[in-house]
Structures are given as C-alpha cells and as structure tokens.
Amino acid sequence: MGSLPEQFVFRSRLPDIAIPDHLPLHDYVFERLADRRDRACLIDGATGETLSFGDVDALSRRVAAGLSSIGVCHGSTVMLLLPNSVEFAVAFLASSRLGAVTTTANPLHTPPEIAKQVAASGATVVVTEPAFVAKVSGLAGVTVVATGGGAERCASFAGLAAADGSALPEVAIDVANDAVALPYSSGTTGLPKGVMLSHRGLVTSVAQLVDGENPNLHLREDDVVLCVLPMFHVYSLHSILLCGMRAGAAIVVMKRFDTVKMLQLVERHGVTIAPLVPPIVVEMAKSDALDRHDLSSIRMVISGAAPMGKELQDIVHAKLPNAVLGQGYGMTEAGPVLSMCMAFAKEPTPVKSGACGTVVRNAELKIVDPDTGLSLPRNQPGEICIRGKQIMKGYLNNPEATEKTIDKDGWLHTGDIGFVDDDDEIFIVDRLKELIKYKGFQVAPAELEAMLIAHAAVADAAVVPMKDDSCGEIPVAFVVARDGSGITDDEIKQYVAKQVVFYKRLHKIFFVDAIPKAPSGKILRKDLRAKLAAGIPAC
C-alpha cells in the first residue's frame, strides 16, 4: 500500500490522555492494587465464590510460577481452551507475567480446528477443562493442564496454583514488540490468522476507554460487570475483563449463556454494566422470565460484535428504562476497539440511533475511497482506517497478509464501509470484507470453500452470508456438483458439520451450474448475494 496525502483525519471529541504504555499489561492492570486490594474482583457466577483484587494478583503470581515450572518462559505460547472461568482470567494474567503469549480458542471447536491453531501458534501448553482434554490429548509436544478435578496424564491447574508466587523468574518484557495475546481472526478475508497484540497495544486500547478525567467508557469501582460473553473472544477479554479490572470494578463470570440464569445473576449481584451482543439481547427480550426479575441496577448496556438495529434498541429501552444503551465498534486487528459511544462517557453527550460511537482517544481515523485510496470528508462513505499504538503488530508468520492490512504509513484498513457525520459519530453501512457474522462469531467463507472443494463430489463452491433475524447472518453455500455424483444437500451439510464448530455449519445449499467469477478467478460474491436477495429457492 502506497503513501497518499491525508487531507481528512478524524480524532476523538475527547482530548488525548497520558497512557502508561511503558508498563507490561499485568502491571498496568494491577497498578492501583494498593487502593483496592480487598475489593471484589472476580465473582464465580455458579458458586458465588469471590476473589478480591489481592487474591487475583497473588493467584496469578502462583500460577505463573507453576507455569514456569513446566517450561513456560518468555516467548512461549500458552493456549487457553476454556469457557468463561476464574481460571481463564488468572491463567491469562499469569502468562503475561512470564512474558509468554496467550492464544485463545473456543473449547467447542473440533479437534482438527484446535490442532491447526496449536500448530500455527506454536503453543506448547494447553489449559483446558477435563471435558475437553480428549480434544488435545494426542498433540505431540504439548503439555495439557486440566482445571477442576484434573484429568489423567495432565498437569493440574490446582498444582500450578500451589507454587511459590515469590519464586517468579525475572523477565525483561519489551512492551512495544512482545505479544501478550494471540487471538485468531480471519481479518478482512481468508483463513484464520494469529493477531499479535502487544503489551503496549493492549494497555493503550484499555486506557483509551477507561483512563483519564473523562473516560469514554466510565466504569466505576462500585460497578458490577456481567461477563457472559466468551473470554476467548477479544471483545470480552478486552472490554470486560481488562477494562473492568483496570477500573476496579467487580466482574461476575458466567460460564455460558443461559437467559434465566443470566437474569438471576443480574438481580442477585446487582449488575450495573451489561456488555452484550444483539443475539443475547433478542433472547432476553423474548424471555418470559424478563419481567420476573429486578434488572433496575443495570445502568449501561454495551452492544458490540454486530450491529444493533433500531427495533432492538427500542425493546431494550422499554425493558431497561434505567439503562443507557450504546454501541462500540471493533476489530481484533485494531486492538480491538476503534470507537465507543459517547453516552458511556463520564461527561456523556447525546448520540444518534445507529451510530457506533466516535473514534477512541490517542488515535486517528480516516475514511478512504476504496478505488483511489484518497481520504474522504464527512458524510461520504468509504473504507474505515485506524492508526495508533493500539493496533496489532501484525499477523503471526504472515507478512504478506500484514502488508495488505496495515499500509506503510501505519493505517490499518478494516474492510468495513462507513462514514463520519458532522458530529464525529461513525456509521457502518457495508462491508468490503467477506466475513460472515453469525451471532457475532466470524465465519470465513474461504475456510468452508476449501472444505467443500475437497469433497470428491463437489466441482466448485462458494459460501456467502444470508440475512437471518435471530443470527444476523448464516453461512450458505452455492455448490457445483460433479456430473453423476448424486450428492444431496444433507450430505454436504453433514460433511461440513463433522469438521467445524457449530457456528460455521452450513444452513442451506444451492446447487448451481457454475460459480460466477471475475476474469481473475475471484468469486463474484455480490452476484450470489443478489440471488439470495431476489429469493432464490433452496435446492
């Protein structure tokens, strides 16, 4: 990507702040430990067990010492294959203390999906629950650590936590260059890639939201934050766990989403901050249990990962009249938050329906013409680009993909089409990127297409999103069957379902004579999406 004149660059309405980006992530999170050592930090939603900030600090030191004893050191990679849990948070902070990198994975992924990420990330330790040990037990060169009651032929998380926390090795962390987190993302296109988020990057991104005299996301020490979104997703890891801990709030950790149990936890613990995604809001709004619980404690509902329509916003306002509702906008590669609703600021300002906030502090944003690369003025849609210390270092072992995403002037190209209005609010209107968003989860068409084409009965295939009221988008496939194969749509669905996690499964198959392609061979997805919009019948 070349260098072009930058005529139109947008910044936050809020002034830049001093960010202690010289600190490693764990030191930044615990920087104010002396003032909140005895305050509640993590609350286990299932048991009610509460760990104070002092408890979490000490436990993360002990687990770090335990990880060190099994070979984890500066530059090692640890995979967390866990549902939401206190152990997840502690293991992440423990790895940070050692200068190790944490890669997170959905425990519902299939063994082949997990094996690919272990190999690609170079993970040598996997921390998981006994229920998921079988998914990783056959991986060569990997030490498996089991939480809970432990498991045969595995190290025990409890054993790690019994180590001497004062015996930690001295580690020289390069905050600008050492990655601390390695989530996997499909970026704007293609197969999942490891996103290298540095200590400095995550410290900057958290500070952009919750630090300063007038934080954009005003979390208080007396707040109780609901953590129902999966921590293996960067939205939850960053905006709930790290932002919550930095602000000194208590975090109620819910292992998995269940509407009734979630409402019970909100009432029981007086939850004040509810970060959600639209599919959860839909389920909550539909639930008969909603009116049986006192949810008046909620003062803020933060929506992310997928757009929230006006109709859904109206439902939230009706059901939770005390809550301020707003949206943020993020992308894993952006560190992850690009913009946040100003209604969440300590000194809030009015926001428009459909907006996803204003650009975060200490960062620059521009809108560029996808064809010319020139920056555009207000109210003109183009590709959203972001620049700042918070963005990723790059994709692990993939300089080509990195160069396609971050240009030589440091601008990260999101693949999202949007505009900035006269009040600095950002609106997303379309996507250049090919990703399918199923309930906020990323589904890369290329991954499913490679699977389909590998089937002996499939000559060609293309995967595109279809709009869905409850899921946002669902993956559907256009398939060219080989002559005489006689393959059915159910056979194709089952073939894919055996290899992928639930949200990547194909929902519909459309048999066609040919896949529309450009002379370059690129699939013309717009043509296929147009067929869906026109109501093509399922085959």
UniProtKB/Swiss-Prot annotation:
Pfam families xrefs: AMP-binding, AMP-binding_C
Annotated function: Involved in the phenylpropanoid metabolism by mediating the activation of a number of hydroxycinnamates for the biosynthesis of monolignols and other phenolic secondary metabolites. Catalyzes the formation of CoA esters of cinnamate, 4-coumarate, caffeate and ferulate. Is also able to convert sinapate to its corresponding CoA ester, a reaction that is rarely observed in 4CL catalysis. Is more efficient with substrates in the following order: ferulate > 4-coumarate > sinapate > caffeate > cinnamate.
InterPro entries, per the entry: AMP-bd_C, AMP-bd_C_sf, AMP-binding_CS, AMP-dep_synth/lig_dom, ANL_N_sf
Factors inducing expression: Induced by heat stress. Induced by wounding. Down-regulated by UV irradiation.
Residues reported in the UniProt entry to bind (E)-4-coumaroyl-AMP: 235, 239, 305, 327-328, 332, 340, 433, 437
Known tissue expression: Expressed in roots, stems, leaf blades, leaf sheaths and spikelets.
Free-text comment on this protein's domains from its UniProt entry: Both substrate-binding domains (SBD1 and SBD2) are involved in the substrate recognition, and are sufficient to confer the substrate specificity.
Name of the encoding gene: 4CL5
Originating organism: Oryza sativa subsp. japonica
Stretch list, region SBD1: 258-327
CDD domains: 4CL
GO molecular function: (E)-caffeate-CoA ligase activity; 4-coumarate-CoA ligase activity; ATP binding; CoA-ligase activity; trans-cinnamate-CoA ligase activity; trans-feruloyl-CoA synthase activity
The protein's name: 4-coumarate--CoA ligase 5
Region feature SBD2, mapped onto this chain: 328-395
Keyword annotations: ATP-binding, Ligase, Magnesium, Nucleotide-binding, Phenylpropanoid metabolism
Needed cofactors: Mg(2+)
